[in-house]
Amino acid sequence: GTSTVALIAVIISSILYLLFGGSGHKNLPPGPKPWPIVGNLLQLGEKPHAQFAELAQTYGDIFTLKMGTETVVVASTSSAASEILKTHDRILSARYVFQSFRVKGHVENSIVWSDCTETWKNLRKVCRTELFTQKMIESQAHVREKKCEEMVEYLMKKQGEEVKIVEVIFGTLVNIFGNLIFSQNIFELGDPNSGSSEFKEYLWRMLELGNSTNPADYFPMLGKFDLFGQRKEVAECLKGIYAIWGAMLQERKLAKKVDGYKSKNDFVDVCLDSGLNDYQINALLMELFGAGTETSASTIEWAMTELTKNPKITAKIRSEIQTVVGERSVKESDFPNLPYLEATVKETLRLHPPTPLLLPRRALETCTILNYTIPKDCQIMVNAWGIGRDPKTWTDPLTFSPERFLNSSVDFRGNDFSLIPFGAGRRICPGLPIANQFIALLVATFVQNLDWCLPNGMSVDHLIVEEKFGLTLQKEPPLFIVPKSRV
């Protein structure tokens, strides 16, 4: 039919473009020689972040790949990252949006995927001046601490049993966000029929779709066809997620119209008071839940993995907490007095940044970086994973050693380009202030309250520490532990 003819025309156009077109820029950064049609696609394996780090050893700070018809520039050192995220931040601030996520009504209202439009600036402002202020974060600390206590109670009931720890962490984080956003739990820990399992299925399916290969990302002419139905599936996931909290939003809107309504001082009240429309609220909540839960759960699972492998480090954190906190439960207000805990979080984020290549940027116009030409609409990736393991910056980069951050001013708040797990510049993760709090809180809660071992008497020497690449960097296989009380 007509669509088949159109598809053939697109494929022929792509081939002609690749053979006789190209970027037209002679001064691109160097890179491996591309093959006809597919470019460098077939040269990449399952762990591109690790391959990019190896390519940087050959080609230097920045290099070029041809991914189908797309020109991609990869930055692999802190100096190159500084050029992209600081010096040329404005010109390189646009987003490359994966074809699967180009859902009408979502991208243009998204903090993550939209370009730096007025809507985007307004949403960032709400995050910066309302949601993630120091005052707001401190006022809600008791919520996060209470959810951590509930997590410990749940794990106490699981003593001697095998527990997939990332599911417990994920559930706890969803409830933390549920209370910060809606002032209520989204589900009950350990109940497979509660709201979270449905929510989690939608969320993880979206992440899988984001992590899966879509030929249209490399041959954009195919984008309009949605050949594998990925965009349609993302739209269905979004619809399902919005339905889960749609009723809660409507209920709140009605409640706010009643005289004498007492503000709950949660994110929904802030969003409604800020005049955001339903599309903007849905997109913002989706990204707070999506980015906030999955990336943080993955980071905390990596921290638990490293602590399982390094019991001496666990003992040092425990000793520090005991000295500073004593017998009461650790609180977020204790963190300034727990430097070794803070160093452990930094070291986890150095070795295991939640988004290994950050999120792809796009050049708004042609510019020059490190004497190379970066053409307009070129896709730009920053290898945060490779930068965190760069032997020119870090001594023994593959060793997990929190000590390297003691008496060090290096931080991950976007000023030190050797440590950028949350990005930097105008597109730095807006939730960084709160993510830092609950990563540290969950790690401290585990260490203070629990002992744990691996299932079936497995030695830590046999613990597999492999990565599953995607938008987020997950541990493969997931960490299973057997918890036991320290009390």
Swiss-Prot record:
Entry-linked CDD domains: CYP76-like (cd11073)
Pfam families, sorted: p450
Localization terms from the record: Endoplasmic reticulum membrane; Microsome membrane
Presence of keyword Isomerase: no
Main location: endoplasmic reticulum
Pathway linked to the protein: Alkaloid biosynthesis; (S)-reticuline biosynthesis; (S)-reticuline from (S)-norcoclaurine: step 3/4
GO molecular function: heme binding; iron ion binding; N-methylcoclaurine 3'-monooxygenase activity
A biological-process GO annotation: isoquinoline alkaloid biosynthetic process
Keyword check for Ion transport: no
Membrane topology summary: Single-pass membrane protein
Principal EC category: oxidoreductase
GO CC entries: endoplasmic reticulum membrane
Cofactor (UniProt): heme
Superkingdom assignment: Eukaryota
Ligand binding (heme): C429
InterPro entries registered for this protein in UniProt: Cyt_P450 (IPR001128), Cyt_P450_CS (IPR017972), Cyt_P450_E_grp-I (IPR002401), Cyt_P450_sf (IPR036396)
Keywords: Endoplasmic reticulum, Heme, Iron, Membrane, Metal-binding, Microsome, Monooxygenase, Oxidoreductase, Transmembrane, Transmembrane helix
Membrane-crossing residue ranges in chain numbering: 4-24
Reactions catalysed: (S)-N-methylcoclaurine + reduced [NADPH--hemoprotein reductase] + O2 = (S)-3'-hydroxy-N-methylcoclaurine + oxidized [NADPH--hemoprotein reductase] + H2O + H(+)
Documented EC number(s): 1.14.14.102
Role, per record: 3'-hydroxylation of (S)-N-methylcoclaurine.
Family the entry assigns: Belongs to the cytochrome P450 family.
Descriptive protein name: (S)-N-methylcoclaurine 3'-hydroxylase isozyme 1
